[in-house]
Amino acid sequence: SYPFCWRCDTPLIYYARESWYIKMTDVKDKLIKNNNTVQWYPESIGKGRFGDWLENVQDWAVSRNRYWGTPLNIWECECGHRHAIGSIAELKEMSGTCPDDIELHRPYVDQVTITCPHCGKEMHRVPEVIDCWFDSGSMPFAQHHYPFENKELFESQFPADFISEAVDQTRGWFYSLLAISTLLFDKAPFKNVLVQGLVQDENGQKMSKSKGNAVDPMEALQKFGADPLRWYFYTNSAPWLPSRFHEKAVVEGQKKFFSTLWNTYAFFVMYANIVNFDPTQHRLEDCKLTVMDKWLLSRLNTTVKAVDDNLSAYKVPEAARALQDFVDEMSNWYVRRSRPRFWAQAESDDRTAAFMTLYTALVSTAKVAAPMAPFMSEEIYRNLVCSVDKSAPESVHLCLYPAYEESRVDKQLEAEMDEVLQVVTLGRAARNLSNLKNRQPLQALYTDANSGLGQLYTDIIKQELNVKDVQFLTDMSQFTAYTFKPQLKLLGKKLGKRLNDARQALQELDGSAAKKELDATGVLQLSLPDGDIALTAEELLIETAQKEGYTSVSDRGVTVVLDTALTEELIREGFVREIISKLQTMRKEAGFNVTDHIQVYCQGSEKVQQVLEENQEAILHDVLGDACHFDALEGYTAQQDVNGETVTFGVKRV
């Protein structure tokens, strides 16, 4: 018949007590009117949960029978007269016992009496203190000691542009702010409210220390860092939805965004240091930009605008995901495609354009990410900017948000590159299905993607997917094998004894030609011994299978087919690429610098030795090798599996 505390299971007994009230029912219509001027995120909370609360508003029991708290500013006389004191000056004016340095808390303020203007007797402060939510609701003006001072400062900041709290504050802070502001100013104290959902455990249960499913925030910060923890909440779901916290998702965000951004930054720093690149000595406007440079700068500015627009609309996940997508494309597409330009030893316009493009993108990314990932953004900014430009703001958080440069945006270029990316992604998926590494060259790729893509894009697809040829087709059915069978439930009665003849005729069909005929005319003509018949698609069972030697993958209306047949020449090229990959890995394992030249040693498989000997020039060029030796092993050695062939390589710094 009575509730229990959900934390300690103590019985909660209600006692009826006298209380001081604010008659909120008298301003109900004003509360509703002012709430309608606020932009709520989501709107359903403002119009629904909070709106319903206002529709059924009750008078506010504002007093508490406690010792700690703001003393209720009402003095009472035994004659029945009551007076609300409005300032220290008024209290001193009406009292002969008020010290100059009065402390406005119990017990000191309780010792101050005032003279009753009606009967002349002493008036004493009532014993109650004020509901702490009244203190919270007074924050907009109390923080500035308004109206006693800072009038202009208060008016410049009121109403607030934005506040945010958990959904349970519809009856707490959101309400107390609106209630007091309506009583005093007859307007809402805020323009925008972003409501936050509660954080739950990974199973969707409320976190509780007693249940043992609570996560210590400080431990999580120590384990993951502040930035990844913040990023998880930004990208996980809309802020107002309950959020299931689990460590795997935080780690995934670390890898997907922070590791990717940091590795891209580290790549730039490493090669910039190697060639002593100084961004203050160049201007992006003077650079001869390639298509890849123009694409990255276009995507950068599209992202700057997308993040700005989404944050302005309080769409936090959309803003964070837009930035995350850009970082992924910058790293896994632009840097991947442009690596050789950064490796170039000789200074050139092309190398300068690559460095300036990536530098611009990284600095702008740090500025855009600063509100969401403040610590990593600061580290990147200070090293990239402050270390070379002493006149720059000393912190990324003192910088202006990057300006959107519409002149840099090329929507057609972005659309075309997006289509190329889609083809490459589908091609990689097809390789995975066929269990073929990207280092193994293939003869051809076929796709029904936009045939208007120019030679530049075709070359990119060839290089990325390691194929010799790319063909754009309108009809991809030639790579699918179609077989036809009779739909027995329908054709059994219709054909009777002729059913076996129809089955035999269907088995002998050219599947691709039959499918085209059916698609074009809606019927399939069959010649039987006793005459022709026409069958509809509903009367047929049509089975599809990929033709042998081809692998296809489709998504978003685009199909990609790989010719997976391997000739001896393709296999040999695959060996060359595999050898290069193994040697590059060994360079890294041996701790060599990217500029170090090496000697290469090889013993073991005759096939691998033959491939290495026949392709020495190309292999040594890619691994910075000066010579190849087959009579001994020196330096750092490791046994390797090269496409099923066992061989031992050695790499030695020159």
Segments the model singles out, each with a brief description of its role:
Residues 25-47, 156-157, 305, 553-569:
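Residues forming anionic-ligand binding surfaces in small-molecule and nucleic-acid pockets
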Residues 41-45, 242-250:
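Short, solvent-exposed helix-loop connector elements
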Residues 52, 56-134, 138-140, 146, ...:
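Feature 926 captures the class I aminoacyl-tRNA synthetase adenylation module centered on the KMSKS loop
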Residues 1-55:
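Active-site "lid/cap" and pocket-lining segments within catalytic core domains
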Residues 12-21, 131, 136-137, 141:
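N-terminal beta-alpha "docking/capping" segments at the starts of catalytic domains
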Residues 157-168:
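A short glycine/serine-rich beta->alpha loop
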